[in-house]
From Swiss-Prot:
This protein's name: Leghemoglobin-1
Entry-annotated residues carrying Phosphoserine: 45
Family statement: Belongs to the plant globin family.
Source organism: Vicia faba
Gene of this entry: LBI
PROSITE patterns noted in UniProt: GLOBIN, PLANT_GLOBIN
Length: 144
């Protein structure tokens, strides 16, 4: 079964909730990542020299890019059944040493952040839609 119109709509609508408070949700996202994988801090240029996760334009921009890429993945999965990226997105992850366990940590942080942003709109169906979209993105990044 392919990615459904309803799944795409769930990802799109909840990504808009993230955009309502990107500073707060960006800090939450990276805080969760670093709680699970403290060594990942060195992979993010905007975090590696900081004492902790502090809101900054670069942090916010990167978080918005990540969430936007997952949203775009949902659109691609619905339209074509696969996610296709330009080579840059995959190569930077290889260059930074991103491994499978890192993708798991980011997925968990992404889901927890969207759950927080969604509030009472959160559901297992919403979670599953984000999981499938993220998994499609992760697969494309690893293949790039």
């Amino acid at each position: 079964m392919g990615f459904t119109e309803k799944q795409e709509a769930l990802v799109n609508s909840s990504s808009q909730l993230f955009k309502q408070n990107p500073s707060n949700y960006s800090v939450l996202f990276y805080t969760i990542i670093l709680q699970k994988a403290p060594t990942a801090k060195a992979m993010f240029s905007f975090l590696k020299d900081s004492a902790g996760v502090v809101d900054s334009p670069k942090l916010g921009a990167h978080a918005e890019k990540v969430f936007g890429m997952v949203r775009d993945s949902a659109v691609q999965l619905r339209a074509t059944g696969e996610v296709v990226l330009d080579g840059k997105d995959g190569s930077i992850h290889i260059q930074k040493g991103v491994l499978d366990p890192h993708f798991v940590v980011v997925k968990e942080a992404l889901l927890k952040t969207i759950k927080e942003a969604s509030g009472d709109k959160w559901s297992e169906e919403l979670s599953a839609a984000w999981e499938v979209a993220y998994d499609g993105l992760a697969t494309a990044i690893k293949a790039a």
